[in-house]
UniProtKB/Swiss-Prot annotation:
<dbReference type="InterPro" id="IPR021752">
    <property type="entry name" value="TF_Rrn7_Zf"/>
</dbReference>
<dbReference type="GO" id="GO:0005668">
    <property type="term" value="C:RNA polymerase transcription factor SL1 complex"/>
</dbReference>
<keyword id="KW-0862">Zinc</keyword>
<feature type="binding site">
    <location>
        <position position="9"/>
    </location>
    <ligand>
        <name>Zn(2+)</name>
    </ligand>
</feature>
<dbReference type="InterPro" id="IPR033599">
    <property type="entry name" value="TAF1B/Rrn7"/>
</dbReference>
<feature type="compositionally biased region" description="Polar residues">
    <location>
        <begin position="252"/>
        <end position="261"/>
    </location>
</feature>
<dbReference type="Pfam" id="PF11781">
    <property type="entry name" value="Zn_ribbon_RRN7"/>
</dbReference>
<dbReference type="GO" id="GO:0070860">
    <property type="term" value="C:RNA polymerase I core factor complex"/>
</dbReference>
<protein>
    <recommendedName>
        <fullName>TATA box-binding protein-associated factor RNA polymerase I subunit B</fullName>
    </recommendedName>
</protein>
<dbReference type="GO" id="GO:0001188">
    <property type="term" value="P:RNA polymerase I preinitiation complex assembly"/>
</dbReference>
<feature type="region of interest" description="B-linker">
    <location>
        <begin position="100"/>
        <end position="111"/>
    </location>
</feature>
<keyword id="KW-0479">Metal-binding</keyword>
<feature type="binding site">
    <location>
        <position position="12"/>
    </location>
    <ligand>
        <name>Zn(2+)</name>
    </ligand>
</feature>
<dbReference type="GO" id="GO:0042790">
    <property type="term" value="P:nucleolar large rRNA transcription by RNA polymerase I"/>
</dbReference>
<dbReference type="GO" id="GO:0008270">
    <property type="term" value="F:zinc ion binding"/>
</dbReference>
<feature type="zinc finger region" description="RRN7-type">
    <location>
        <begin position="1"/>
        <end position="33"/>
    </location>
</feature>
<feature type="region of interest" description="C-terminal cyclin fold">
    <location>
        <begin position="349"/>
        <end position="496"/>
    </location>
</feature>
Length: 865
């Protein structure tokens, strides 16, 4: 029953009432509405009393009929639309729920608990949805769906936030988590309690009067109300005390039958105090647990590997997420992010540099994502449950995707037999999570050092913010190693650096035609207009334009002056396909841009579209030509034939028996330019370790940039295109792919040096390493140091740290950007308080040690490969 506008329940604030036996009750709480009197119907209408006034509603059919007849017949169209909109708005307002009736579930929940529950629920929902799509739409086996959730449960148990019996604190009151909340329903509960007592008194009084033997005496005394109220108050107090004791203490049975934990929920006026069975440490760990798309990639990839899929790479899972195959919405990504503004207000975080806050949409190169996946795999120790990856099967899949002859696969396998490769996603030869922090230790860290702890998870030295991007780790993924083998195979087989590159015979493989096909298929995959791509007279511009300062640099205004800042992680990466995450399936508004469709949904679910996206473009373009043949009438016929040409059955050379016959260009093989020195690639285990070690050698961003920048001037156009295109396919930065190529190249061209380094490391013999010690930009001193492994090892896989043969202080890498005096000196902005003597002393303190490239990179090649 709808009430009048000013009728409102005094107990709960509801607006709906029901009439029963002459009384009006609230539909929401059942409270009695006292100011109500039911009247009789008169004159076809109904009268209701609200407060002290009367509202009379009459039905007059004659007047209504006359009013309708008097309305104009031909109304303007605008007026008709206006009246229709008014009626529709009135109807929607009547159907809408009033604000007083709407109870939000998080109104009575603390913000941190509500945010924590949202993160766990949203991430679990994404995992369940991804598993369902993999099984029911992409035709993976059903056990994948179970392995995904089981892997996530194992991750939560490792971080001690699975909320199981082992994480409960028992009966120790000091370790329990106590939630102190505001009782938002205090006034409502107080009104309901008064109304309940009032109704209980009336009921008890009537029962006492009907059962009493001296009922006539009570009626004749004149004070019946006083006696009944006193009796009702005494009974009500006893019942309330017993009910309060039962409501406050609730027994919760744990997995251990001999132990029971009391959960105390006490409401004291405006404050509600809930003493839970969980420990405070578990809640703190759960609040800073890593839950982002990088962790989603790690869980999905490990679950697929645990299900027996050996050829699925990390780059495949990343590409599926970017292609919107799992239909992850922006809202879901927003919910799994940590509450950064709240943490900044509490003083836990100084700057917005939290792991999953700076870049939530996977705009990272592959080596950045591999860091998170490696931490996940090594922390949970999943190597025993994951199927081992085979180099042969992954190489065969790569050759098939690129439409290369089968002879290329045999040559790649020959190279792998000469130079064995570790293709395990664990990356134990490169890094060890025990050298830094695992996932459980990161979750237990203090919030203010949580981000730096994640970046130094492999034992790197903490750096300043201005030079940190040069010192971060670059991990070589199995995807990058496969591309390195393919590049070296092509360079040893064909003369990529010369004008003439293939035999003039239709039976043999033409590498130039294949490069042209690869270029067109990549542009088709990127979404270019193929009617323009296959015309020789048309120029097709690139879709992605590099920013002036680089993708990792931000331009902003600070106090009216332009500033450029660098992010610690390599965020903003767009050298991949697709360049951004697509939210087409979950967006509410259609796109306004003319984007070429990448095929039907049924075609996108084919296994070829999942595993061989480059090869799948022939299906996409073939369907596009069938739908609109007129658009492709004026294209170059030779380019069209090259696009659909099959190169898998072609021969590369004649029958081969020796290494020189398999690789005819090995005799005249030329090395690209390499730097003479390498820097910013060593780090002590901790600041408190002696300067002689233990020291870790790693591949840094600056060393990769120096290596690629030095060699780029000697690249041929064919090799430059292949490096860019193959890096684009796996979504990796080309500097990491080229670093892997140089390491593989050193194993083949400098095999004696590599073997000597390997023997010295296994026998703990000092390795002579030339160095240059720089005090300023012009003065340097040559040095020689001996490098040995920290402990005797019997396998290269056990190599972790190094030690220097003698103590010296010059190996400390102190970049010039840390010292503010030197920054001011170089910018010619010396403050008045800084004297020339202080500037000279600062220059003498700045020391930088550069290592000989060939020897140092040879040590990394032995360790990484």
């Amino acid at each position: 029953m709808h009430s009048a506008k000013n009728e409102k329940c005094n107990a709960c604030g509801g607006y709906r009432f029901s009439v029963n036996d002459g009384f009006k009750y609230c539909d929401r709480c059942g409270a009695l509405f006292e100011n109500f009197e039911e009247l009789e119907e008169e004159e076809g209408g109904l009268q209701q009393t609200v407060g002290q006034g009367k509202v009379k509603v009459r039905k007059n059919d004659d007047q209504k009929r006359v009013r309708n007849n008097a309305a104009p017949v031909n109304l303007p169209k605008a007026q008709v639309m206006r009246e229709a909109l008014e009626k529709r708005s009135d109807f929607l307002q009547q159907q809408a729920i009033k604000g007083e009736e709407l109870e939000l579930p998080h109104d009575a929940t603390p913000d941190y608990l509500y945010r924590l529950a949202l993160r766990l629920f949203s991430f679990t929902q994404i995992l369940a949805k991804s598993g369902h799509i993999l099984v029911h739409e992409l035709n993976f086996e059903s056990r994948v769906q179970e392995n995904i959730l089981a892997t996530f449960q194992k991750y939560l148990a490792h971080c001690q936030v699975a909320f199981c019996h082992s994480e409960q604190c028992g009966n120790d009151e000091h370790l329990r988590f106590v939630a102190v909340m505001e009782n938002l329903r205090y006034e409502q509960e107080e009104r309901e309690e008064k109304q309940r007592k009032r109704m209980a008194k009336r009921g008890k009084g009537v029962n006492a009067l009907s059962k009493s033997a001296a009922a006539w005496t009570l009626l004749t005394q004149g004070n019946i109300t006083e006696h009944l109220d006193i009796a009702s108050d005494e009974d009500g107090d006893q019942d309330a005390q017993g009910g309060q004791q039962l409501d406050d203490l609730t027994l919760e049975t744990t997995q251990n039958p001999d132990e029971s934990i009391r959960v105390n929920d006490t409401t004291m006026g405006f404050v509600r105090k809930v003493t839970t069975a969980l420990s405070k440490e578990a809640l703190r760990r759960a609040s800073q647990l890593i839950l982002n798309l990088e962790m989603l990639v790690a869980i999905l990839h490990s679950a697929l590997m645990s299900s027996g899929y050996q050829t699925i790479l990390t780059s495949d899972v990343v590409r599926w997420i970017r292609e919107d195959r799992f239909r992850i919405s922006r809202r879901s990504i927003r919910l799994i992010r940590q509450s950064q503004p709240e943490r900044m207000k509490q003083g836990e975080v100084v700057k917005p540099t939290i792991v999953d806050y700076a870049e939530p949409f996977l705009r990272f190169p592959l080596y950045e994502i591999m860091r998170t996946c490696t931490i996940f795999h090594q922390s949970l120790k999943l190597a025993s449950s994951m199927a081992p990856q085979s180099f042969e099967s992954m190489s065969a899949r790569l050759v098939d995707n690129l439409n290369l002859p089968s002879d290329i696969l045999s040559r790649m396998l020959i190279l792998e037999s000469i130079i064995p490769c570790d293709v395990s996603p664990q990356l134990l030869k490169q890094v060890d999570v025990d050298m830094g922090y695992n996932c459980g230790q990161l979750a237990a860290m203090s919030p203010n050092v949580y981000y730096s702890g994640f970046l130094t998870s492999f034992g790197r030295k903490e750096r300043g913010t201005q030079d940190a991007d040069f010192c971060d780790e670059v991990l070589l993924s199995p995807d990058a190693k496969l591309i390195a083998y393919l590049l070296l195979t092509l360079r040893l087989t064909f003369q990529l650096d010369n004008a003439q590159c293939a035999l003039q015979d239709d039976q043999y493989f033409d590498v130039d035609s294949w490069i042209h096909q690869l270029e067109m298929r990549i542009k088709c995959w990127q979404g270019h207009n193929m009617s323009l791509v296959m015309r020789s007279s048309s120029h097709v511009p690139e879709m992605v334009v590099d920013p002036p300062f680089g993708t990792n640099y931000l331009f902003h205004q600070e106090k009216g002056a332009p500033q450029v800042s660098c992010r610690r992680r390599q965020a903003g990466f767009q050298k991949c396909i697709p360049t951004e995450m697509s939210f087409n399936s979950t967006s509410t508004l259609p796109t306004v841009f003319d984007v070429r469709h990448m095929g039907l949904l049924t075609e996108r679910c084919q296994m070829e579209a999942l595993i061989s996206p480059v090869k799948f473009q022939r299906t996409v373009l073939g369907n596009e030509i069938e739908r609109d043949p007129l658009t492709f009438e004026n294209v170059d016929r030779q380019s069209k034939n090259t696009f659909f040409k099959h190169f898998s059955a072609f021969k590369t050379t004649e029958s081969c028996d020796t290494f020189e016959e398999y690789f005819p260009c090995a005799k005249n093989y030329l090395l690209f330019k390499r730097p003479d020195w390498i820097q910013n690639c060593t780090a002590r285990q901790t600041h408190f370790n002696p300067v002689t070690g233990p020291i870790r050698f790693y591949l840094s961003n600056q060393s990769c940039d120096d290596l690629l920048g030095t060699a780029a001037t000697s690249f041929s156009r064919r090799f430059q295109f292949l490096l860019d295109a193959l890096s684009l396919i796996i979504g990796e930065d080309k500097k990491a792919v080229y670093a892997a190529f140089v390491m593989l190249e050193m194993h083949l061209t400098s095999s004696e040096r590599i073997q000597s380094i390997r023997d010295d490391l296994l026998t703990s013999s000092p390795i002579t390493l030339k160095c240059q010690k720089f005090r300023n930009s012009t003065h340097h001193i040559p040095r020689k140091y001996g490098v040995i492994s920290e402990v005797p090892i019997d396998r290269i896989e056990n190599l972790r740290y190094f030690r220097l043969s003698r103590q010296f202080f010059e190996h400390e890498e102190m970049p010039t950007t840390i010292n503010m005096e030197l920054i001011d000196y170089r910018n010619q902005e010396i403050r008045d308080s800084v004297t020339e003597t202080e500037v000279q002393r600062a220059q003498n303190r700045i020391m930088k040690l550069c290592y000989e490239f060939e020897q140092f990179f040879g040590i990394l090649a032995v360790k990484f490969w």
